[in-house]
Amino acid sequence: MSAPFVLAVPSKGRLQENAEAFFARAGLTLSKPGGARDYRGTIAGLDNVEVAYLSASEIAANLARGSVHFGVTGEDLVRESITDADKRVLLIDGLGFGYANVVVAVPQAWIDVRTMADLDDVTTGFRAQHNRRMRVATKYINLTRGFFAQHSVVDYRIVESAGATEGAPAVGTAEMIVDITTTGATLAANGLKVLDDGVLLRSQANLVASREADWSDTARETARVILDHIASRARAGKYKEVRTRFKGCNDALLAEAHSRFGVVSPFGGPTSSGMLTLHCPPAQIYALGSFLRQHGADTVSVAALDYVFDKENPLFSKLAAFLPQ
């Protein structure tokens, strides 16, 4: 019996809920046969898949080790915790939740400090005046070092933070911070501001693949099936299905619809009876419906699409190109 294909997802909170909802929308239902407290799960219809419920940081670590094939975690954790991340893991696709920015934040009282160049000047002056480097509180040690090096800021030292990083300047354990934020409200409440060019990373939850995992033929086929579900759902979300039939429906009219409304005709041009099926961007639905009626259509129906399967699977092609041959 072949080893299971392991998919790691967050074990609690909003991230778990969003991850399970994402897979459910793609027709992949995650469940815990052992109950809510079980840390192992399954996907209906994919018997060789084992779902591992882990913390977001554990998911990144397991991806680096190759003990899971796919994992759902934030790009910030991937970039921070995995050395040479682009060679060891693949960010297959952003999942549309878990948005947050990793930022440099300084006290609002520093009215003359708005950019990283300003910060460079201030840190240099601070060291000359106080004979010590400015302290930066953060849990993003590697991201901070890399970003500060890009901006030639050298007169600082990192104070590792385990939590409540935004409070460090107020209690005197650091002069500034590098932390993650969604709205900036917590930073502002603690008297901090984000530098104009101080965004290290715009992060979101990603589906990530490990190059180090055991990519047997069975594992690759399982990955193809999972990614086929995800790609077909994503493709369906871009369009509504439009149907009509009228005598004046011809190839010239279809070409104009393509040009004006960005539609695609997945099953070719109109039939001999004038029957036509189009996939149309939602924002263009009314304009397309009006256009078709102006040219002779009595009825135009519009329906939501659940899935649109295509011969090509760009997500799996991306993965196949990344994995060892």
Curated annotation (Swiss-Prot):
Domain of life, source organism: Bacteria
Compartments (UniProt record): Cytoplasm
Q: How is its activity regulated?
A: Feedback inhibited by histidine.
Q: Which GO terms describe its biological process?
A: L-histidine biosynthetic process
Q: Which pathway does the protein contribute to?
A: Amino-acid biosynthesis; L-histidine biosynthesis; L-histidine from 5-phospho-alpha-D-ribose 1-diphosphate: step 1/9
Q: Does Cytoplasm show up as a keyword for this record?
A: yes
Query: Could you tell me the EC number(s) of this protein?
Result: 2.4.2.17
The molecular function terms in GO held by this entry are: ATP binding; ATP phosphoribosyltransferase activity; magnesium ion binding
Q: Which CDD domains match?
A: PBP2_HisGL3
Which keywords label this protein?
A: Amino-acid biosynthesis, ATP-binding, Cytoplasm, Glycosyltransferase, Histidine biosynthesis, Magnesium, Metal-binding, Nucleotide-binding, Transferase
Q: Which reaction does it catalyse?
A: 1-(5-phospho-beta-D-ribosyl)-ATP + diphosphate = 5-phospho-alpha-D-ribose 1-diphosphate + ATP
**GO-annotated cellular components:** cytoplasm
Q: Which cofactor does it need?
A: Mg(2+)
Q: Is the keyword Plastid assigned to this protein?
A: no
The main enzyme category here is transferase
Q: What family is this protein classified in?
A: Belongs to the ATP phosphoribosyltransferase family. Long subfamily.
State what this protein does.
Catalyzes the condensation of ATP and 5-phosphoribose 1-diphosphate to form N'-(5'-phosphoribosyl)-ATP (PR-ATP). Has a crucial role in the pathway because the rate of histidine biosynthesis seems to be controlled primarily by regulation of HisG enzymatic activity.
Give the protein name, as stated in the record. ATP phosphoribosyltransferase
Species in which this protein is naturally found: Rhodopseudomonas palustris (strain ATCC BAA-98 / CGA009)
